[in-house]
């Protein structure tokens, strides 16, 4: 009981399924959710009877980020439920309500997302299943995050059964944070970093690509079986040569690749406010060469989310330093005061700055 009262009480109070948060404050106008420039993404609108209806951006661009407040809660609406329902200067607000007819309003939540970038990301994704995540490398600030298929937060209650039964499209799934996929050739960033952390000699490691290579009892092919000829690390990275990076992984060994993947944050909790699944790296010290080769090129059992791979590339752009990703910039009181501004925090050092610079240069060769 002591533990419950002293240590766990805040968690229970803030829980999105706590009915007291909505039933106890029927006259409170729930705070708005805003983009970084102050555009309302979700806000309460007053009804004639004094109640409020939650209204959302109708594009669907923010559905997975903002979430909803019916059938339970999801997204920012869930994680920041307590903040949105909390009344700052409650006594003064209630006096203003009684004598001046002013609304009693909860705090606003201001996102790091820029609506202009969010629109660009949504247009680029179109109707392709997947997601786009944009991060500011030096801070970890999420500038855009979209997922498709999406849904309309305004009509979740009416469409609840359909949204939950659509297994083919899974519209409620935030693919940016909850979708786990093989990273494919983007994992070659990890393999390259792993080799360079061992020795700079791998920058000049040469390999003759014939379009396929044998690892154990498995034949590994380059895309379309194309032979790249003689390549070093830079040209192999630019051409995405599977044989090269599988061979390099065989040279450095399982334990080194495991170490680098761990250094980059695979299998690590992110402490991110939206529901997420952590990146999974399953290679073991005694895994055979076939599995090692597949892992080195982003296949095998490795699974990661778009958010996490955006963090990986951001670490390369930030001198090897991976920042804690965040999507809420600050809390804003009804009077406009800023509270609880999120400060950039370093999550981990993924690799040396010199290694990051070399990989960044190689990434430019891909474009």
Where are the predicted features?
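Beta-lactam-recognizing serine transpeptidase/beta-lactamase-like catalytic domain environment
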Residues: 138-185, 190-367
């Amino acid at each position: 009981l002591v533990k419950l009262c002293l240590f766990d009480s805040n968690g229970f109070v803030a829980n999105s399924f706590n009915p007291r948060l909505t039933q106890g404050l029927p006259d409170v106008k729930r705070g708005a959710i805003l983009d970084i420039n102050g555009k309302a993404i979700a806000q309460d609108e007053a009804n004639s009877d004094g109640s409020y209806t939650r209204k959302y951006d109708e594009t669907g661009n923010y559905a997975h980020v903002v979430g909803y407040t019916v059938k339970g809660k999801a997204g920012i609406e869930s994680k920041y439920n307590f903040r949105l329902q909390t009344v700052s200067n409650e006594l003064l607000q209630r006096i203003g309500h009684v004598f001046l007819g002013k609304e009693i309003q909860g705090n606003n939540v201001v996102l790091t997302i820029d609506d202009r970038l969010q629109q660009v990301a949504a247009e680029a994704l179109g109707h392709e299943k997947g997601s786009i995540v944009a991060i500011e490398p030096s801070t970890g600030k999420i500038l855009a995050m979209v997922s498709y298929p999406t849904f309309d937060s305004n009509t979740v209650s009416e469409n609840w059964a359909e949204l939950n039964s659509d297994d083919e499209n899974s519209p409620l799934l935030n693919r940016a944070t909850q979708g786990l996929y093989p990273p494919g050739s983007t994992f070659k960033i990890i393999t390259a970093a792993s080799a360079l952390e061992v020795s700079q000699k791998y920058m000049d490691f040469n390999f003759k690509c014939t379009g396929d290579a044998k690892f154990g009892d498995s034949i590994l092919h380059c895309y379309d079986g194309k032979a790249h000829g003689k390549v070093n690390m830079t040209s192999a990275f630019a051409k995405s040569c599977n044989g090269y990076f599988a061979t390099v992984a065989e040279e450095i060994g399982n334990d080194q690749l495991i170490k680098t993947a761990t250094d980059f944050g695979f299998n690590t909790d992110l402490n991110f406010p939206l529901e997420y699944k952590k990146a999974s790296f399953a290679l073991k010290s005694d895994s055979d060469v076939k599995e090692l080769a597949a892992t080195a090129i982003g296949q095998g059992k490795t699974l990661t989310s778009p958010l996490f791979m955006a963090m990986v590339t951001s670490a390369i752009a930030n001198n090897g330093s991976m920042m804690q990703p965040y999507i809420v910039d600050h809390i804003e009181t009804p009077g406009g005061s800023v509270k609880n501004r999120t400060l950039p925090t370093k999550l981990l050092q993924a690799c040396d700055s010199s290694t990051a610079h070399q990989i960044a240069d190689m990434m430019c060769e891909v474009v």
